[in-house]
């Protein structure tokens, strides 16, 4: 069976994405108040010198959107300088719009007034307005290589994910946000920034469904920090979640991963990064964004670090900008990607499969939500066993979950609409009907690319076309 290995192709100069989530050491989440152009450039230079191609950046929502109908133009100019700093050294960045949750604390704009972020119509409108305003300002800057709607919205929209919204509600909200990007002229790939913590990956229904939102996004971005009592399970956890997150057939970017060096030695931090990077590569990830760029020792008396002090030391550089062990591992990984000509690689086909029980995400009669963690744990252990045996496997659903499917999207006639401006592409495939099968993609890229394609590759077992690459000169398979 063909295994998932879809890649983004829209911005070759900074692809594959290998980067860091970025807050400057001058302020953490409040960096835009304390913005120091010289320090930011020094921080970016260290990342670039170690092979990183991009960052993920953040519009701290209370500061950038201080009034319902007002954007802080001073902070926007500082952000533009931040973008210029990326361009100066050939890096890109993925701005994140709705940043109300960060590192163990939630922050609201003062005007929110307790309104629901998903179901209050006025509040949804204000979010969409902010997304469109920021997109219009920065969509044409060459440093912008993608967009994320939120940071970990499941933990912000409903704190602790208590009383989560329905999938219909979240999908409508996601549609409004992604459509705001497109209506404002943003052509770069977009995703939600939710962490891929929904039912297809975790078995927990928090309203965020990869299948249901696939129509509107261009890639999936797992956030993986989970620890385990067993070293092989821990080293393979991110890879396992990337495999599950590939259910839509879209590129999987490991959008957040890392660890605090308050809890581990430098040597073991390096081991964790090395294992996570290489295992997730073999698990189908095609982008990696570490958490995060620096330590924050000088911010010990500010929130969130005064109450979550371990959050100060997730950095891949220390608080004066010197590389830590994880950054050296990222640099070595960058060399591996270069040596294997990663843009022209795809995963080797597999002769074996792990069956993902439909009970993980379906509410069958006499099934209980409490059963799902056991399904997840058993499947995780099965995956670890196959990797220990050096047995390449694909993920699939039960045969009864996989009725005869129409030709996969790679095999369909291309759409006739012209490519969207600024997006590298061949013509887009028509959207396939949503499927419950893990053997075929649930959808094509989102409206990002109605008439354009921002990614390449297919995981469908019924695909009759070879994997498409931006340059067809060579395709290398890996296990």
Predicted regions, residues:
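Active-site mouth of glycoside hydrolases
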Residues: 2-217, 229, 288
């Amino acid at each position: 069976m063909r295994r998932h290995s879809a890649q983004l192709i829209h911005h070759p100069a900074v692809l594959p994405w290998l980067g860091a989530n970025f807050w400057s050491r001058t302020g953490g989440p409040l960096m835009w108040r304390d913005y120091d152009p010289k320090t930011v450039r020094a921080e970016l230079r260290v990342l670039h010198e170690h092979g990183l191609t991009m960052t993920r950046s953040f519009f701290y929502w209370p500061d950038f959107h201080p009034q319902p109908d007002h954007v802080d133009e001073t902070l926007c100019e500082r952000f533009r300088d931040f973008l210029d700093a990326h361009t100066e050294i050939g890096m890109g960045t993925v701005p994140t719009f709705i940043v109300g949750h960060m590192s163990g604390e939630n922050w609201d704009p003062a005007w929110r007034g307790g309104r629901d972020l998903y179901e209050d119509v006025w509040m949804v409108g204000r979010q969409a307005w902010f997304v469109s305003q920021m997109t219009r300002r920065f969509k044409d800057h060459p440093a912008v290589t993608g967009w994320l709607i939120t940071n970990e919205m499941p933990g912000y929209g409903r704190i602790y994910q208590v009383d989560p919204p329905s999938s219909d509600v979240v999908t409508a909200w996601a549609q409004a946000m992604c459509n705001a990007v497109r209506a404002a002229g943003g052509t770069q790939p977009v995703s939600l920034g939710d962490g891929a913590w929904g039912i297809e990956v975790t078995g927990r229904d928090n309203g965020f469904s990869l299948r249901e939102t696939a129509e509107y996004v261009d890639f999936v971005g797992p956030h993986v920090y989970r620890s385990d009592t067993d070293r092989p399970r821990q080293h393979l956890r991110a890879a396992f979640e990337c495999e599950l997150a590939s259910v839509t057939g879209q590129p999987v970017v490991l959008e957040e991963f890392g660890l605090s060096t308050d809890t581990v030695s430098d040597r073991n931090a390096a081991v964790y990064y090395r294992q996570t990077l290489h295992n997730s590569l073999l698990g189908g990830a095609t982008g990696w964004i570490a958490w995060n760029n620096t330590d924050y020792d000088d911010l010990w008396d500010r929130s969130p670090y005064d109450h979550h002090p371990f959050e100060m030391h997730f950095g891949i550089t220390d608080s004066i900008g010197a590389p830590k062990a994880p950054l050296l591992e990222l640099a070595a990984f960058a060399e591996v990607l270069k040596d294997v000509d990663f843009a022209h690689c795809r995963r080797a086909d597999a002769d074996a499969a792990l069956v993902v029980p439909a009970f993980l995400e379906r509410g069958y009669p006499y099934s209980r939500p409490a059963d799902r963690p056991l399904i997840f744990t058993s499947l995780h252990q099965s995956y670890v066993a196959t990797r220990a045996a050096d047995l390449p496997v694909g993920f699939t659903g039960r045969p009864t979950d996989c009725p005869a499917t129409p030709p996969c999207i790679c095999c369909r006639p291309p759409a006739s609409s012209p490519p969207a401006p600024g997006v590298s592409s061949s013509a887009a495939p028509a959207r396939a009907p949503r499927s419950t099968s893990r053997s075929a993609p649930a959808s094509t890229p989102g409206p990002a690319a109605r008439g354009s394609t921002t990614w390449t590759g297919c995981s469908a077992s019924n695909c009759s076309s070879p994997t498409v690459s931006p340059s067809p000169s060579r395709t290398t398979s890996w296990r």
